[in-house]
Each structure stands twice: as C-alpha cells, then as structure tokens.
C-alpha cells in the first residue's frame, strides 16, 4: 500500500509564511464597505511526516521532545503591527503549548489593496476574526472533539490587542483558561480624566465622518528603539509596521475609548490574568536614550492602576528596562518577561487531569461534554480564595514606584 501523501497548501489551505519555518492560513470574513475582508492565522510549519489526516490536535503540536502541556495559545498583535516575534512562538512551544498568532483584518498579512489599515469602528468587530481562528485551532463554539475540549485556551494580546482580548474574554469566560496581556492599552495616555474630556469630541467626529484622519502623534521613536534599520535589533516589514504607524481615524479611536471606558467600569474576568508592563514610560516630543529602555507609547502607571479593573485574579509584573512590546526589549528584560510568564503558567494554568479509565470509580463523574479539564471552575474558586489578597495588591499597585511620568 502506498504511503499517504504529505499535506500541501492545496489540501489543507495552509501555505508557506513570510517567516521562515512558519505557515499561514487565510480566514475569509464577511466583506465590508471596502470589499473583501480576511484575517490570517500563523503557526509553526510541521514536517512533511505529520499528516493532516488523523491530526487530533488540529496542527501546531509542540516540538519533538517537549511534553505537551495541554494548552493552546492564540496571540493577537497591537495597533499598526503584525506577528513577527518568532521568539514568542519559541517560548510558548518550549512550555509545551501549541502556539498560533492572528493577524487581524486590515493588518499585516490580512491587509488588502484599497483598505484603510487597521480601521474598525468597534473592537467587537474582531469577534469574527477571533472566532474564525479558534475554529481552526479546535476551540470553536461548536467544537465537539473530546480531545480539544480537554485542552486549555490561553489568550495573549499586545497593546490594542490586549484591550480587545480583555473585552472578548469578559464575554467568553467559559472558554478561556488564562489571559496574558503585554502592555495592554487599558487606559488613555492622559488617563481617565483626559479620556473623558476627549471622548465626546471624538465620538462626534466618528458619527460625522469616521474615516477623517486625526493629527499624527507618533514621531517614530518607538520604531527607532525596535527596528534593526535604526537603533533596534529586530527585522520586520516596514510596510506592515510603518515608522510612524498607521494613520489614526476618529472612528477607530472612538472604538478604543469605548473599550477603555468598559474596562473602567470593571470587566469581572474570573480567569487568571497576567499583565506585563515596563517599570517606566518616556513620553516626550524629542528622542532621548531612555527610550531604548522604557515604554514610549503608553503611560505604564495609568495602565497598572487600570489593570485592577480587569477581574478578580490579576498578577502585575513590572519589567525593568522593558519596551512597549516587552518581548522586543533588550535580552535581560526579555528574559525577565518570559520568566514571569513561565512562572504564571505553572502557578495559574492547571494541566489537564488524566482521563479516568472506563469502568473505574472515577469514570462517569464528569458531566457529558465538560471533559476532565475545568479551568473556569478552578479559576473562580481560586479567585474567591484570594480576593482579599488582590484588594491589598491593588492598593500597593496604585502606589507603585519606579515609573517615569511624562514630562511637559
């Protein structure tokens, strides 16, 4: 009998990615007034011997020699960004996780000619992108695969992606084991007072003409600290991640401000959350060397304070010398960030329990369709147990030192 043929792009839909060793899948979405809309899912390319037929894990298995920990990670980028952080994939796979990254509609791999880069008028629009990705990963709403029901889903978002995933998690808590936020844009740079002053004018502009461009405030300093073409160490596509960022439009900023207002009211997330932030911000109109070792996009003190409104069990890790995207920081800060994530995963994301043998005393004690992995019940129990401790931590977070406030 002939050997089964290895899967190809024609048989699976997956095609070679722009990143060596990775592959991508285009996810068709509902069209909008600019035409065709897609998202793009990215994962490590598997070797030819890993046939798609009988693939119980829906692709993207951990590396050979690494024990499968039973968790799957979906990463979502921030504003004017796309997935290129291969070291992040390396890290999660070394933890025994399957790793996937999503380029949202009108970003990176998903940007089509004639589209307004990054433009939406509601962050809930991304629900369709996220659901399409989760369906491919085996975590869709209608997933009936018992193998996948016992795997935990960890979401990781950077900046605006962190805000988007926080809002999505609050609406879909029964499907999530944990949430990792890399410098999430939970609050406006001028904090809540500035946001509330600005919001009415932005909302009016969004109603009148959501695509009118707003003044450019990105001076390119963050790109200078990150890109190898300048003072940074990373190679990426400057067309997909421009030096001064995409043009900001009123409709998009209005969507962000609405999302931040929702966080301020409290999202009530009951699953464990990890927030990674630099210890300092440098928000200045001129370049300084400190921008190589601090967040030049967000006010980290305001974000740290707002993170207490995410839910009941929030761990805040402040990383000395970290950039806005902490995994693009210099090696010492990057290593510290990864160690914080690894520690959090070990402590807060339980591994699946071994399935009971048929006929054993334990068999039949789990409700049909629930599986032996119960992240939400565990998280809610843990959250209740530490609620008083979290209140104390929140008070300490509001007095966190070591952050540089923006100078006039």
Task: For every predicted segment, state its role.
Residues 1-66:
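N-terminal cap/lid segment of alpha/beta-hydrolase-fold proteins
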Residues 45-104, 111-113, 290:
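Short, surface-exposed "cap/lid" segments of acyl-processing enzymes
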Residues 79, 103-108, 185, 320-323:
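Short beta-to-alpha linker loops that shape the active-site pocket of alpha/beta-hydrolase fold enzymes
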Residues 119-141:
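Alpha/beta-hydrolase active-site loop
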Residues 141-159:
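Alpha/beta-hydrolase fold nucleophile elbow
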Residues 160, 164-248:
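Alpha/beta-hydrolase-fold enzymes
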Residues 215-314, 318:
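Serine-hydrolase catalytic core
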Residues 313-408:
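Catalytic active-site module of serine/aspartate enzymes centered on a nucleophile-bearing elbow/loop
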